[in-house]
Regions:
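Short hydrophobic/aromatic patch on the recognition helix
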Residues: 37-47
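Hydrophobic alpha-helical connector segments
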Residues: 56, 63-92, 104-107
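Helix-turn-helix/winged-helix DNA-binding modules
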Residues: 24-25, 45, 133
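Basic, helix-initiating cap at the start of DNA-binding domains
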Residues: 1-35, 52
Length: 184
């Protein structure tokens, strides 16, 4: 992708993320294009529809989590930190995950791949340090992500959703810690 095209795509993603957070997922796409300083045609050249735009934002957020996780690989509790950050991401992007729920399985592969990559090294570091269970696998990251994301889809008050998210995280951390492992 040419540099100018990549910059326009990044502006679209940033404008969309801000607009969705501020105004919800129903914000008109032409307003996102205007905020990014591009035309509608540029928006649709990059993203065929709203779901594709939302998916791209979600992938970008998980890739950012991966970068931040790799920067902490010297911390033996990095996998526990990763789960905490993943739970926060799931709560912060509840609307995004709802919007992509109906996508085809293949469309979600970039999210699954980014999540696996983000957590794999952290899992290995924390396992080597004896901080998390030795029998955890990279595939368990997907199970944990589904569990941690469930409260964001609950039809409850925002306060209850936050409480459910915190409790889900506590349970997940307790499940993955090595037997007799210290609380982070």
């Amino acid at each position: 992708m040419r540099q100018d095209a990549a910059e326009r795509r990044e502006r679209l993603l940033k404008a969309a993320e801000e607009a969705f957070a501020r105004d919800g997922l129903d914000v008109p796409l032409h307003l996102i294009a205007e905020k990014a300083g591009v035309g509608r045609a540029t928006l649709y050249r990059n993203f065929a529809d709203r779901s594709e735009l939302v998916l791209a934002i979600f992938v970008e957020q998980i890739e950012d989590l991966g970068r931040r996780t790799r920067a902490r690989l010297n911390d033996p509790d990095v996998f526990l930190w990763f789960l905490d950050q993943m739970a926060a991401l799931m709560m912060g992007s509840a609307g995004l995950s709802t919007a992509i729920r109906d996508l085809k399985v293949e469309a979600m592969e970039p999210v699954r791949r980014s999540l696996r990559e983000a957590g794999a090294e952290a899992l290995a570091v924390s396992q080597a340090a004896g901080r998390v269970r030795a029998d955890l696998t990279v595939e368990d990251i997907r199970v944990l992500a589904l569990m941690l994301g469930a409260p964001s889809r609950a039809v409850v008050s925002p306060e209850d959703r936050i409480a459910l998210s915190r409790r889900s995280l506590e349970l997940a951390l307790d499940m993955v810690r090595a037997q007799g492992g210290a609380r982070a």
